[in-house]
Amino acid sequence: MSSSYASSCTKLISLTKQLSSYANQGNHEQALNLFLQMHSSFALPLDAHVFSLALKSCAAAFRPVLGGSVHAHSVKSNFLSNPFVGCALLDMYGKCLSVSHARKLFDEIPQRNAVVWNAMISHYTHCGKVKEAVELYEAMDVMPNESSFNAIIKGLVGTEDGSYRAIEFYRKMIEFRFKPNLITLLALVSACSAIGAFRLIKEIHSYAFRNLIEPHPQLKSGLVEAYGRCGSIVYVQLVFDSMEDRDVVAWSSLISAYALHGDAESALKTFQEMELAKVTPDDIAFLNVLKACSHAGLADEALVYFKRMQGDYGLRASKDHYSCLVDVLSRVGRFEEAYKVIQAMPEKPTAKTWGALLGACRNYGEIELAEIAARELLMVEPENPANYVLLGKIYMSVGRQEEAERLRLKMKESGVKVSPGSSWCLFKD
């Protein structure tokens, strides 16, 4: 072996390490410049690892044209069947162009192992195409692995009936004798939390404890919230007390649990303890406090926390924060204040915000603001029959049958049908 060849090999190895360092540390433009230099100046062929790193940086730096060029050179070098190059190509096309481009490439890859299948499944779930992800899983011609199930389970959470289907895939995962890991458990806790599956939450908690996953702070925070949604304050406190490092997520989860349980006093006390522990509250922590105030009708306290959120911590109030404040003010009959809050919103009020005001107006017989809220609500949700029914009931409760009848006719002309089981007889055909 000549000294020049040995020198070239040594230099190539050194530059590959440098390329890897750039790509893994997020210095993607530097990585791509180095790749172009290596590709143009070396007589020695670059290996699959170099191409996969270049594609990773193309995806991160959003460089689809260069990514296409690297793709062409990958094909020329016969690297398309390499799983690392294949996954990197899928990632690049999925992020820079579209999932359909990624699928087209996936169909062209000659040898697809589980890693490549999982990459395509993950692309579908990341862009919300869970149906396609499940169909692709069912079409797998290789043995699935933990990542296959994790991608599906994680993608299903938050979709319609997704929690139940996520649990079904968890059961399949167990049948395949795969061990759930932290990713699996985090998704499952979210799924169980959404449907109040208390027994399964305990099962997951027990499994995590036996397999030494339970100490992970993110999982513990998820368990606190999940137990809270099931109304099990005993388990909530048990998990929280076992946490050594309580970050803002953990504290927020505990506040949320108390709020859901209707214990506003404990929720506010927990918020104060969090501040004493020198943990800076975030927007979620304040939202949970406002929810606790709303459930308990603590309007003055809600106003204080709403102002502190912006004044003391410089946090921007979202639509959800405004909705909570409107809700608590409306609940205690402070309609004018609630309406002023809505008018001061920097963004367009949501149906939830107007609905909170309208519902409270009905309870208190406040017609003038009810009409304003209903008019705005019908603009936001013109096809929701519940909005017509609620305003109609308000009219009828104060003896304004003519307005109720006009509303019924407007509803009929608009093609909006009343929900089955509505108690408002005027709206029945």
From Swiss-Prot:
Keywords in alphabetical order: Repeat
Domain of life: Eukaryota
Repeat positions for PPR: 11-45, 47-81, 82-112, 113-147, 148-180, 181-215, 216-246, 247-281, 282-312, 318-348
GO terms for MF: RNA binding
Recorded family membership: Belongs to the PPR family. PCMP-E subfamily.
Keyword Repeat found: yes
Organism per entry: Arabidopsis thaliana (Mouse-ear cress)
NCBIfam families: PPR
Protein name: Putative pentatricopeptide repeat-containing protein At1g03510
GO biological process: RNA modification
Keyword Repeat: yes
Positions of region (Type E motif): 353-428
